[in-house]
């Protein structure tokens, strides 16, 4: 991509996209990756987020621009009262920008240090959890849950912001430059689950449990008036390895939480959220909502499955959002009910029946998973790994980083797929759809 210009937008200036012309009212905030402005068109007020593309190294710009566009796509695609909605996207002198909902009620950081009764605390948590649920239902993991990314509209409804883009960049910097990057990159580390920041586990599949962990840390901070379970940020910066060891050993300050909680159920919730092992945390957002006393949202009835149903896997998150793999057509063309999934190798594009593109990460194995169609119940089953020959020995070999379905790990014995299920393979999520 061409070199972006270093720009600053002044109050009163105009920003034009293909859809509209906006007037800049004032600057709302500035960070290392970009700036946010309050803007208006002829009728409404919005927020405009501009990336400082000129601050990135040339080899980083393509990835960042792609991730930024993904965040816009997520925000424009998902209709939820608990997620900041995206309305417009364009470029300004080589710097991408998006136009979003304007949230005038501040963010959750503004409430840290205040005292809440049980009802008010539950209401705040409910809105955050509903936003996470709506993201997870679409196969999107936020991966950067912290108070600054929980905004409030003028009705004090919490809304999730900054999903997808900053987490991706920060996570990569954190792993690649573990001891020497800017404070802004590392600020997320105190909320991150161990598997996100540990280089030995960084390539493992990330599912809803990633956000569950960060939610637990954030609620601990809110309840205790600004404390963090494993110690303050300065301790993290002073000795990251020691801080991460405390996460691993689950050595956190329960006393502060017990003393501060308006309801002791929060001790139970947070204790489970910040378990070291992902499988020991809550598996779904609905489980936390249930503990809080909220009835699970009634899901739409799953469509009936028939022998003639056409099964599709749709990419929800990854390099090729929106791409669809037609399982029924692939099965018929192969005359086989067994399909393989793995990393797309451009030098050998027919290694798998379904090759998943992965340009900036290395999560997907060459031979990652297997889909098998059952003529008995007309459903597909997914198994981790593939039957193949390795070092001259035939056998079933599992993938390096695993497969998740609805946030639960799948082994080689397989799991039955249902319409609406979310499959996570590496950093890519696929939604099961039938026509």
Residue locations for each model-derived region?
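Protein kinase glycine-rich loop
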Residues: 25-31, 36
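AlphaC helix of the eukaryotic protein kinase fold
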Residues: 58-77
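Activation-segment/catalytic-loop signature of the eukaryotic protein kinase fold
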Residues: 89
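Conserved short submotifs of the Hanks-type protein kinase catalytic core
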Residues: 93-107, 111
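Activation segment signature within eukaryotic-like protein kinase domains
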Residues: 124-125
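Protein kinase catalytic-loop region centered on the HRD/HxD motif
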Residues: 130-140
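Intrinsically disordered, low-complexity acidic Ser/Thr-rich regulatory segments
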Residues: 286-363, 372-377, 418-419, 428-435
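C-terminal boundary/linker segments immediately following FHA domains
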Residues: 341, 377-379, 383-384, 389-435
